[in-house]
């Protein structure tokens, strides 16, 4: 391998060794290397933001920007990151007290905050964190485009502006504009692919082994799934390069060894995040699994057409017309060695075919059934298309071949025009974008003789990629908005600000918890509003939390990975909720109220209490955990029809009536009270005071077939009995509670005996001053004689071995270059 020269290398020659330019031009040369990446970044981020503005999305208009999990997870988790960095969180990086009554945070951090650009959120005021989250998308896409520009230059030298334009084509691929546009951690996979491509080239050049390991670690720190996909893509790139380059067998083996060893060390560096997340996933509440069902072939192929957005979870495989036309001319380009053309074409074809074959699709997803969009690896194909497009462009494609590729694109669009949901901006992108792209490439070819045409060609190429991608992004937003799940949600408003302020007015953590109430702004209002209620939505919600909260009457969805609050004073007493926020009298306003609550740590007698009411009643289960009889659970008379069900019961006048029917969806009427029932999402609902007659009559208009409210849907709360129970738990409970980031310590009254019960679900990872024992899903510790303090510490499962492995990897990372230096010194000596 020789040094870098100004002569272009052919596509099948060995890679350069990265020699340096001597003399005073070194600084200028280094600066000029930034032109291409900078162009790619500006075109990519600019096009996406232009589409953002064209749609009138916040802050360019009044349309909400956050959709689906962006509103429910990503913005709240970034607000939690802001709190953590600014020292205002009720928890730390290992554990959070804000949501789910206390949950691990490390796995959530890795999964939802792994994109390094997520740290932009901590640089703005908390009220504007949502804007920072939205900005992560164009910044990450721009970074991916810039890195692809660098990678293309390592594959084959060429003009910086041409590489920059094709880098932007990659950054603006259909997957990024649609499926990943609102998912910050997925977008890091777009960065990881060219990052690992550069690492592959270093392995082939037999240099920068530590840099390769660090690049692998950087890719895997972002997001497990997309990092795994990018790593598999890097394996494909390495295989292609090993086949096409003129290398000896020894060189190939050394490159393989460097790649394998650096990958292992890089992944081990991420093990403190990766291993706890893997174990948390195993301990999470199970969800329903579905088999991968490939889309029809015409739908799959239509996903490759520019600016195409088909309904639902269909693949977004396209890049801009310029990239498709160049890629289409690749096989015809005789300036490229035949072997190189065949190997790259075969690799690209095999990659895209693997998306439709269930066994290989499972491999792309880590041997798991794809959850959500099944084609989240589509960016890999887009990257391959851009690579072959660059190899074609760098080797001066003939105009006839370009015209033939453009004609094939138009013909394919015509054939696929009747595909279900075909439409939008596909034809304008193919005809308009394709024509301008072909014109630009024609001018570029003519520019070999008339240099004045080259700047015109460059301007046209930049303009067509920018315009076509802007249209594609806006089209993706508009067509996606037709789907119910994608309805944009507000993440900043006067109501949200007042909600936040109301929570702050009554915050008393850790003396008591504050429930942010309903209606909720997001599924993670505990994190978003810095409260401590049960509201929590995470892929890592533990099965132990589900088993603790579901029997008590908390509403949930997503198979139990999302929990909601419940306005119920018995549950408030169980979980030490001493403050609650509710909507105010005027729209958008919120009011906060305080109520007596036991401390977070209470003392229960050695002999467990059992409710006298029917065991299948949610009210009996609440009483058993509370340790006192506070409800009247009457027999219910059922009447009406299947769709208009009636229920009647007799309770003590003046008591407070509650309703629980997790199987019914519809509308409930009880006197002047009207409630929406959303089956398992609703939880326990208040009906109001029992009238003087003592008779309760409830009507449920339901659309749920073959279901009813069960045997004991009504419970009537005896408020004085509850007050007495709260008073007893307060008098015998902890006199002082201190909650650290992932620790809790309680001082108990002298002479306490029995069991100390912490108002925390017994999730894996807790270690206490005495052996932990279960108490109806809550954390509990037996009290030996003369015990006056109880303390517990949370450590995520897998953190300790993960840290040990990372330290070993770090030592290896430091030892390799040190050993190399010592060897060179000895050779010189």
What does each model-identified segment do?
Residues 72-73, 255-343, 347-351, 357-375, ...:
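Periplasmic/ER-lumenal interhelical loops and adjacent helix-loop junctions
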Residues 74, 632-829:
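Active-site-proximal, structured, solvent-exposed surfaces of multi-pass membrane proteins
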Residues 141-155, 160-245, 258-277:
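Membrane-embedded helix bundles of polyisoprenyl
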Residues 467-484, 504-571, 605-615, 763-764:
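Extracytoplasmic/lumenal acceptor-recognition loop(s) of multi-pass membrane glycoenzymes
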